[in-house]
Amino acid sequence: MRKKWAYWRRAVISLLCVISCLPWGQLPAAAEPDMPEVLEETWKQNDGLLVPANEPAQTDTPEVTDDEAEESLRGAGSLPSSYSLLDVDGSSYVTSVKDQGSTGLCWAYAALGSCESNIMKQGLDIPESWKDSSGELNFSEAALGWYPFTNHLLVGDLTSGDYITMDNKGISGGNPTIAGYGLAAGIGPQLEQFASMDDWSQGYSEYQRYNAYYRMQSSDLLQQVDTAGRTVIKQWLMESGAVSASFYSKGIFFDNGDSIAYYQKRHGTGDADHAVLLVGWDDNYSRENFQKSCQPKSDGAWLVRNSWGADDVGGGYFWLSYEEASLCEAARFQMTQDSTPVARYQYDGSVSYANVNFSAAANVFTAEKSGKLTEVMFPMTSNNSQGGWYTISVYRLKNNAQSPVDGTKLCSKQGTVQYGGYKNISLEAQNVMLQKGDRFSVVLELRKEKGSREKLWLSFESNSTETLERHCSIQSGQTFICSGDTWIDMVDVKQWQNSSGKKPYSNLGNAAIKAIVREQDTAVNWAQWNAAMSYGEPAADADPLYQAAYAEAAALSEDATQAEVDNAAANLFAGLEREGLIQYSQYIYA
């Protein structure tokens, strides 16, 4: 009996060894993979806003728990009773009131207003040539409303095939999530002078898809604004600048003689239909300032910049009660300015995801140039809005790697993340150096808290027709998920069948994990600029875009950054294309 037991024990051990070494996730037929639920990000359209489909349409003013009230009071202790970004020690950190006209681009005006404010609040450099005719920074809402909703088929772009289909594209509506995901993918912010709303009918050039005069480093999103959330928003306003937010706008904007006040309590967050910019607050703004037939219970209101033009009531500003029942989707956008060339490695060019709580996910990339991996980015879905604990690991893979962890671990970092939005984890101190041609992986795990086994939701692109028509592309060897202790190619996971014979993951695409690499070669490549400038100065009657782009390109100095050179060349290519002198994608790889 002992010999037989020893034989079977060796057989079982051998079988387990075989299973653990299966290449890139080939599971034996008898194995039951972990098949967690898929949560699609579903939205419904309320005028110019896309709001979560499961939000209640009717609600009373949210109840505040004792814990929330205590937390809010602790945070509020260090905050002033009033604050306005329009006047911080004599300086304004808000750009002028814009007019969205008849478009549904309120979400883009609010998001980019937050970006502009953050850049000003940080004191980032704003060259004179980047300012509009009124002398201020002015980003293109049209570009942000166009490219995420437009397919692009550029050979070599790993996000080709990732987009959303909507009638009239982003003019039909959007939200801060779409704005954040688009900016994270490198779609803007573009300058208004090179992608004017006036050009919407003829469209925008693919040459300009990735024109970005600054880079969005991260975003934070509060889906619901409770009492504790008010304190968070106030802190954001003081730390980072203006905050995008959404609310139901079909109530009465009451003119009390001194200001415009807005409050209603019949419609909840599910009815939110308009995005605006929070630029300040006043705890003592009297409840008596609101219309007598519908007044909040307490004093206090947000100072709001609208996007209905400076000729609108209040000069484009109004006060919104703290108790506004529909206030939601508060978002801030943190911007940065790169002085040296930066490469963004990504597969997720989409702006809409599905969420699955797999144990871990990984993306595998190939370094196009030598450089230092300085940042990893990933989204925290609204289902993870309470925050969580992340673990990021980076591997340099073997030539014959059989999984995304089959190689040398270059670093591992853990920590907490808060709120929804697109997160940015700095790996600057980890000194992760990559050589051209290196295959490397970025592995992401999300848990409820440190030491917890409770998994949080990981985000993946999705092909879905629910609410919106979403498109994504994926290839073998790009994204992997961990099921138990086995790494499996997402292309294979898409074929898994559950006990009902359905394929719950068939719509999934790549994992939303990005790697930011600061390139080692800092010499500026002027090849595209030279190619664009070779066509010479435009005629006096040439297209305005061509003229503006030529002026920008001609004004560059020898110490221009790679980003400045790339933006100028792309704008000039777009102008040449508009004139019929070239066709996309000519010169794109110059």
Where do the PLM segments sit?
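Beta-rich interaction/scaffold domains
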Residues: 521-590
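Sec-dependent signal peptide cleavage junction
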Residues: 22-34
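Bacterial N-terminal signal peptides that target proteins for export
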Residues: 2-12
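Bacterial N-terminal signal peptides
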Residues: 13-23
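Alpha-helical support elements that line or immediately flank enzyme active sites
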Residues: 100-125
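Short, surface-exposed beta-strand/loop patches at domain edges
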Residues: 445-520
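Aromatic- and Gly/Pro-enriched, solvent-exposed loop/edge beta-strand patches characteristic
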Residues: 385-475
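Predominantly the structural core of cysteine protease catalytic domains
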Residues: 34-40, 45, 76-88, 108-116, ...
